[in-house]
Amino acid sequence: MKKIFLLLIVATSVLLAKVNVAVSYPYLAAIAKQIGKEYVHITVLGSAKYDPHFVVPKPSLLSRLNKADMLIINGSGLEIGWLPPLLKRANNGKINPGRVGFVDVSQVIDMIDKPTAVSRAFGDVHPEGNPHFNTDPHNIIPIAMLIEHKLEMVDPIHKTNYARNLKKFLNQWYIFLKKFDEKMKSCKDMKVVQYHELYNYFLKRYGIVSVGTIEPLPGIAPSSKHTIKLINTMKDEGVKVILQDPYHEKKTANFISKKTGARVIVLPHDVGAIKGTDTLESFYSIYAEQLCN
């Protein structure tokens, strides 16, 4: 009887134990929460308030990685400047690249902007392609499916729960996408300038034309010569919108706005990056609200 009682305790502990999931960025946490629900405990490594390329590798992140059963990253080199040293020091074999607990969501994305050559002369380029694919709401679908698949592998006991949560989430997301896509139709063929090539996936999805960038090259601060050239291009092309992210300096965009009459629109790069974008739906909705109204 004692052995049976102990076995019941162990079995109950296993059923109630949560999967510790570490994610590199908030949008991944928002998706994982929808799939994992009460069976996962999620910790976010990077803040939406800062440049995703440069997360400060604080010691507190080591303990989070050390305890993780699963690590979900954006991939495509976005975490290359800060995550590898932390992974090495965390010494957690469960979440190393190639293991079941390591999830690189870029692997299920049709990448764009792949450079034909990799050189510092071209700025801060990503060999695998543009890593900012989360700006396209349609990319949420394959990412959610991958996360669910990996959760099933890490925690097979709750396999049916994850599958059910995924189905419910996708049904809701398809409804959201239908409405969102309809709103975006009025923005087709709009011409914009962006600070960084942050919104390319979003722009490509909805037929919006990026005429240029405030950065002369990725990761390179704008020069006076490049800024004047961009102003002239915007006047020639009739560009009336400048897309500004929350973490780059805004002085240059405001200067260009005064010279061209274009309005500066600050769009979030991640869930929670600006006020009122704490959910996946609100994160994307603000794109349509700011651009197409």
Q: Where do the model's predicted regions map?
A:
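Extracytoplasmic metal-acquisition and chelation regions
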Residues: 17-293
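Sec-dependent N-terminal signal peptides
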Residues: 4-15
